[in-house]
């Protein structure tokens, strides 16, 4: 912990992370060159990140590029979360009321918020209550004409049993919307503040319906965000143009290019040569290079995330919690901290990060005791155990090097006589294959843009999350689920804390997954990039990003104008 604080201080001083979704259409560029770099340093910046894009609609994404990078650029939500105070703040809803002891929520919408004008849609009206009703009815109403479009899967909200929880969402007038729940839910506002809850254009949906092109709603996005989609080249880059009608004011940069074309050391090389202006999720092993280069800056924030190893609890012998405990004892977590995170993470004792208000301070990190592992396996009569470990290939905010992590776990288990076969998987392919339940172990993680513990518990480990394809452990415990429901129904923070701590003790005993690390969020960027905000909950808007020379030029022009006014 001390080393972690020292690293945070040093970086602060230097600077003062497609089967269910059909293939995406690739919008043609509008009056722009097909190569992303020629004029970008004068008219925008390049953001380098790894990831696979399966949808532009955050409602249909489970994590990754859409949530971590694109959502805050293309869309807005009813509510936001302040990245510094962790409190809810107004967004498209300028105010709200909690009624009926948390069973009714009424939102008063902003007026004069325009939707983006794109090559595929020109709006004729501003955002209103019809758009909010459309956006949420599509998710929870199975009879809605857009519910089944592009697969009908909404992983985050499905994991929360959103369709079973919401009784209705109604337009009271053009700028007032009311949600009625079937039971009080203290976490409801927090879920609406996540990037999974964008407001879509109902008018755009109507136009697509008339054209018979409904599937384009998730492929050619229209939102109210600061940037709009101009061009997408699969596996190469995404170009965004600023929204000249953005309701918060004109974004500073005319365009942003999101470079998808390189990973690992390739992205670092691009940053060092100036081909990238911002490097998302640099590997912790690259920190010394980044810190020592005077042309670069680093930002670091605590992250609301967890990396974990999930056990397929429906597959023998992992359906026996004693086997899961034995495997956990054989993993050298301190070596993971040193070899993967280089001091940029805390060893996790719970799926909740330590920053969570419901974190159980009595939680203990699983000890490293391979001899005890051998004894347990011998007692159970288990020999020559072979396991398949499914591993995502792309770096994530919670794990910068998944494949290397898997190799270290493989080596640890080999020491206790367990053979591990590493199976690399990517994107939605990973989710689809995991739902076949043919895996034994999977290395994964979770990050959230909510400060409510429910954003970790239900998506990862509720019974409903098995169907929504986010519960990779395939673990279902009625007692655990009941504790989560009690926490949701309570409006008393102390009671919610107690329920969530009881839930954490069940997880410690049953161990459907092994928490590994809660990682700090890292971002590296060129010295002349200013206004870049790194949030614990995911990426913030790029609307305020600018180059230092642009500011100097603006000040110079203003000075010249002032000089001209002098007598």
Predicted regions and their residues:
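Ligand/substrate-recognition segments at binding pockets and active sites
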Residues: 26, 234, 378-450, 493, ...
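Extracytoplasmic/peripheral linker and loop segments enriched in polar/acidic and small residues
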Residues: 31, 38, 337, 415-430, ...
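N-terminal lobe/hinge region of extracytoplasmic solute-binding protein
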Residues: 33, 46-101, 137, 144, ...
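Gly/Pro-rich hinge or "lid" segments in bacterial periplasmic/extracellular proteins
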Residues: 82-83, 174-175, 185-251, 255, ...
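Aromatic- and charge-enriched surface segment that lines or borders ligand/interaction sites
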Residues: 94-146, 178, 270, 317
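Surface-exposed binding/hinge segments that line
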Residues: 108, 131, 140-141, 145-205
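Ligand-site clamp/hinge motif
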Residues: 212-218, 243-289, 406, 419
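Append "and occasionally in soluble cytosolic enzymes with long acidic Gly/Pro-rich linkers
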Residues: 239-242, 318-411, 415, 476, ...
